[in-house]
């Protein structure tokens, strides 16, 4: 049971392409993108997330790109606050800035059930999307990326398809959502251009 009301004056709807070369909100208000990227701000501590939101609030940025999956890189070697699947990650206790390149999506020691999504992971991302929405900031989701030590970049086509279906079903209703298929798609050695074309048509 719910009640439908007119949109508030701050709610201009989702951003669309306008007159081929421009962007505008659904109600026709022009949108001029001033974006930034904070890859896994959403998977940090509550304190870091609050700091990020406060920084954004006091900036000119009106769009931020960030990941659904955790990211493995030399400035981000810690474990995320949660994982997208039920299971356990590879032991990262011996991970250093000197050896981090030895860890890849093919690293042994990960045990995930790719048929069971960790619901709390996605619920938390939804809260981040809503916090951005309430600040008038577009949430540009990077759905896949190759910077990985957990095996998420190595999923099969069937596992990818289930993941895409789930992510779209969860997040597509939010008016501030944008979709980035992937960062550095060409670094996924086992995926073809045809695979990416298929994802783009979803």
Residue map of PLM features:
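Ligand-binding face of N-terminal immunoglobulin V-set domains in extracellular IgSF glycoproteins
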Residues: 1-8
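Active-site mouth of glycoside hydrolases
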Residues: 12-202
């Amino acid at each position: 049971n719910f009640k439908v009301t007119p949109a508030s004056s701050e709610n201009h709807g989702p951003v669309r392409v306008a007159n081929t070369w421009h962007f505008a909100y659904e109600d026709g208000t022009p949108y001029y993108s001033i974006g930034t990227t904070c890859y896994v701000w959403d998977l940090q501590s509550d304190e870091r997330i609050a700091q990020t939101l406060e920084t954004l609030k006091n900036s000119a940025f009106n769009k931020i790109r960030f990941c659904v999956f955790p990211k493995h890189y030399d400035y981000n070697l810690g474990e995320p606050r949660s994982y997208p699947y039920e299971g356990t990650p590879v032991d990262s206790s011996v991970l250093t800035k000197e050896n981090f390149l030895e860890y890849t999506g093919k690293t042994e020691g990960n045990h995930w059930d790719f048929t069971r999504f960790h619901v709390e992971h996605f619920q938390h991302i939804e809260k981040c999307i809503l916090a951005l929405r309430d600040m008038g900031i577009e949430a540009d989701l990077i759905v896949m990326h190759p910077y990985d030590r957990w095996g998420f970049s190595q999923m099969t086509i069937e596992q990818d398809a289930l993941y895409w279906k789930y992510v779209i079903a969860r997040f597509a209703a939010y008016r501030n959502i944008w979709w980035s298929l992937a960062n550095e798609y060409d670094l996924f050695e086992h995926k073809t251009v045809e695979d990416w074309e298929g994802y783009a048509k979803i």
